[in-house]
């Protein structure tokens, strides 16, 4: 679950924005234009004067190709129709409002290159593979030997001799290795100078003309460092989900949206992780990570419940509270007050343990809306059956 939960500390940008940054650092990218209408796509197609273009949905998620959000076209009629289709679709719940029209490139080979943080070695790690254009996680799972990894010493960085050594592991020819070394150095600069958490090119294409070109571009930033990079922060294009997460943060919650239908309200990140694991263990899918913290204020419970029920996919709510600083009777009072303000028929499973747990349970026991559980396992099973 760590990648899902930690995503609240990361800022993603669109492919077209990442390519603009690549261009500033001298990394070759294909000609492209951002468009928001089918008419705009046709105009861009004609301006490029090329036979083929690729139309790519611009949304802050992966899997665009599998969802039908990436299309190669070779005439204006297809370009117009495919753009209409893409602009009308939703990918992983995110509406597509803009597309990137790119010149189609004749590709001889595809490679994968990325820089990210390896928390085990506490260093930046360079990952490369000759199996580019594919899901790199799938490559790592099925054929891990195809991925080359190098840890970067932060005191040394990536001087010429190291860049060339790494480049030769993919390109034995001197000319191509030289081009690759330069790209590796510039990607590393992007990573370090912008406080990125991930810089990825997939694929990095070797064209039939012998040039190396970033066909796709992805950059993820650590939002804890954005105060140092106002120009990066200006690129932020929040999705509706991220707006909800930002609103939750303002209210003092840790909230991350997920794809399931069991809403979770928990106090403490560790208990939240354990609750989600328990739900998964018995075949359920959490709809969110929501940590209300250690406050004993019923108002926070009211706000948290409103936040959970904004998600139309939530079919049941599981509340798992360990009363230490948080008093279980205050949580119960907050729940009663919340449903005086909220018109919802969603069933609510409540597990209260710790400070004033018996008082909290008694407050809720007379209301059929609430189903009381005494253990985390019981709560998870009740949520699945609700």
Feature-to-residue mapping (PLM):
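Short, small-residue-biased leader/transition segments that mark boundaries at the very start
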Residues: 1-7
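ATP-dependent carboxylate/acyl-activation modules
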Residues: 10-200, 205-319, 331-333, 340, ...
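Catalytic core of bacterial c-di-GMP phosphodiesterases, primarily the EAL and HD-GYP domains
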Residues: 324
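Extracytoplasmic Gram-positive cell-surface binding/anchoring modules and repeats
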Residues: 328
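Short internal beta-strands
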Residues: 345-354
């Amino acid at each position: 679950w760590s990648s899902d939960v930690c995503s609240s500390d990361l800022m993603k940008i669109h492919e077209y924005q990442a390519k603009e940054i690549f261009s500033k650092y001298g990394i070759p990218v294909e000609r492209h234009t951002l468009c928001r209408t089918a008419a705009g796509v046709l105009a861009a197609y004609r301006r490029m004067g090329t036979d083929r273009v690729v139309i790519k949905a611009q949304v802050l998620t992966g899997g665009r190709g599998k969802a039908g959000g990436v299309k190669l076209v070779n005439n204006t009629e297809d370009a117009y129709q495919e753009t209409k289709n893409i602009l009308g679709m939703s990918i992983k719940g995110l509406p597509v409002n803009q597309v990137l029209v790119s010149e189609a490139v004749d590709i001889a080979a595809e490679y994968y290159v990325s820089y990210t943080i390896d928390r085990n070695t506490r260093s930046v790690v360079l990952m490369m593979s000759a199996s580019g254009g594919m899901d790199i996680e799938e490559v790592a799972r099925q054929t891990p030997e195809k991925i080359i990894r190098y840890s970067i010493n932060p005191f040394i960085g990536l001087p010429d001799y190291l860049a060339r050594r790494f480049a030769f592991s993919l390109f034995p020819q001197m000319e191509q290795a030289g081009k690759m070394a330069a790209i590796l150095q510039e990607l590393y600069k992007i990573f370090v100078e912008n406080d990125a958490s991930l810089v990825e090119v997939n694929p990095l294409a070797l064209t039939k003309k012998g040039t190396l070109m970033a066909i796709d571009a992805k950059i993820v930033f650590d939002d804890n460092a954005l105060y140092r990079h106002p120009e990066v922060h200006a690129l932020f294009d929040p999705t509706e989900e991220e707006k909800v997460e930002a609103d939750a943060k303002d209210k003092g919650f840790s909230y991350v949206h997920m794809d399931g239908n069991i809403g979770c309200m928990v106090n403490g990140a560790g208990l939240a992780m354990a609750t989600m694991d328990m739900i998964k263990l018995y075949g359920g899918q959490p709809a969110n990570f929501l940590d209300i913290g250690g406050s004993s204020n019923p108002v926070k419970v009211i706000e948290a419940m409103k936040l959970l029920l904004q998600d139309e996919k939530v079919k049941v709510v599981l509340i798992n509270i360990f009363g230490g600083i948080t008093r279980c009777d205050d949580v119960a009072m907050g729940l009663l007050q919340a449903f005086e303000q909220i018109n919802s028929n969603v069933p609510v499973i409540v597990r209260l343990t710790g400070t004033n747990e018996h008082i909290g349970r008694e407050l809720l026991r007379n209301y059929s809306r609430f189903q009381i559980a005494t253990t985390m396992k019981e709560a998870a099973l009740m949520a699945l059956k609700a």
